[in-house]
Amino acid sequence: MNNISFNLSGKSEKPVLDTLYTLKKVADSLNIPLFVVGASARDLILKHCYGIEPLRKTGDIDLGVEVAGWEQFRELAESLIATGQFFPTPEKQRFRHGTILIDILPFGPITDEDKKIRWPPEHEIIMSMVGFEEAYEYSITVRLSSDPVLDIKLSTLPGLAIRGQPRVLLRALGLRPAAPGG
C-alpha cells in the first residue's frame, strides 16, 4: 500500500499482529477490502499515534469488510477457518484466533436500503451499518509491522464519530458526554 499515515511498527503485540496479518492475507486473496473499526481502531490511534493511553482497553478486534453479499462473507469465513488458525464462535460475526476475539462486520452492497444487514439463515439478527462506507472511504493506512510488512486501514477518530460512537471517543479522552438538553 502507499500513503502510509503512521508507521507503528514494533508498537503492537505479536498476537494482534499475527491475527491481523493472517486476516489481511486471506481477505486480500479474495479481493475483500477490510479496515479496523471500533475501540480497537480508537486504541491504536490514540495510544500509538497521539500518545494518549485509553481509559478502557478493548478485548477484541473489530473489522469492517466490504462484501457484495452473504456468499462472499461465507467464503471469507470459510477461508479463515481453513487456515486452521481461526475458529467460529456461537456469535455469527465473531471468530477466535488464539486468545483474540475478532468481530467481522460486513458492509457495502450487502446492506439493504436502510444500511442494515440481516444475518442468515433466520435473518432475525439485524445490525445497522450506517457510516461504515464513509468511515472506510476516509480511513487511514498505518504500517503495523515492517517485517513482515503489514499495512492496514484504520477508521479515523471522525470516522468513529460518524459510525455513531462519539461516546466511545469522549470516554477515551476522559470527557463526559453532555447531558440531554444541556
Specify the residue positions occupied by each region the protein language model found:
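Compositionally biased terminal segments of proteins
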Residues: 1-182
